[in-house]
Amino acid sequence: MSNDIRSLGKSGKKFTNWATTYSCTPELYFEPETEDEIRKILAYAQEKDKKVKVVGFGHSPSDIACTTDFMISLCRYNNVIKVDKEKLQVTVQGGCLLKELNDHVLPANDMALSVQGAVCDLTAAGVISTGTHGTGAQFGIISSYVVNLELMKASGEVITINEEVNSELLPAAALSLGSLGVIISVTLQCEKAFRLHCKQVTNTLQNVIENLDVYVTSSDHFKFFWYPHTESVVCFNTNRTKEEPKVKSSWIWDMGVGYYLLQILLWFSTFFPSLVPSINRLYFKLFCSSSVERIDRSDKIFNFNCLFKQYVMEWSIPRNKVGVVLWELKEWIEKNRFPAHFPVEVRFVKGDNIYLSPCYDQDSCYINIIMYRPFNTLVSHETYWNEYQSIVAKHGGRPHWAKDHNFTGTEFIKLYPKWNEFCAIREKMDPNGMFLNANLERVFNSRPSPSRNHV
């Protein structure tokens, strides 16, 4: 069997994440198509005393997917298993892309996911394993919509987890960082298909912060972008609607100016950083100075173009800490004249009871900072990242699991009331740590091993 399984793997395969900020070369790279193949790969890994890392589409802008041992991509394990139109639930294999659900499966059955993030090129397993979220005060992270999981343990045993079977595992398995096993299938609770009406309006940072609760609760899915080096904010007030679609687009404007020209200007700013404040002001004036309305299918409003390669860092904080964090960040940027790119994205998520959820037991706000990498150029960002982390850490910040952070179990045990409970479940499910890589070894305070290259 060993030779048969080894022949399924590729050696010398380099894995690079979408942002091209992390890469690794696993000893063997697998793309299994069946549950039995996954089981045999795990058995072979045990035989050879190898770690196993399961990866999706590679959108995580950190080293969470990297390993030098065995890597399993679920890109071929991606079928839709069942659509239950009565319960409004969809069951898929772990590698099924949200894009497939959005474009084909859910519209064909008059269904939709209740909330989504910015990107749809994500696997179902990856979305729930890293705590992917959208925005909306009454909407949780996508993991909170999990109603059933089938999980393959390191032993090859597949267990079912839901509110009736192994229910004690559900708060851990719904967001596990891939540390409990391989997600064979996941069932997500959906709702009837719906359209969204997004009204984009300008505002000031001070006004939004002073009236934050009003803004957050007056829309189904409220978020705002702050443009550093300005007082300017663009608010996105998004609500469900039965109105007909209303979409206006221009390739020249959206791509020519909004993508290609911006990339050129930001590339010049790598030589002349003092240009960044002017670029931020220019693009706010070009794209945000007037009100814009869009009505479209829900996923087309939730998802948006993330433009070109980038560094990002995102933290979740208690909702009542938004003002103090943003004012401290703004003050630091201005005092140090750091050329911070736009936007600082601010979103809002309902609290939940998932052990490793950044929203555990609190309604939360996610604040995402960004530094673009025009034409894949290396851009200085470390001091910005370190300062932002120090600011949010003072105010109970919890990092987005898919993104860069320097925290370890020492910090997490103080931030997550159910940290010890999760660790006990992980050690029982995977006693030999097969599913740990360097990223997770840092998180759980095990001995780290090199697994990635960083740029």
Kindly label every feature range from the protein language model:
Residues 1-455:
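Noncatalytic alpha-helical scaffold of FAD-dependent oxidoreductases
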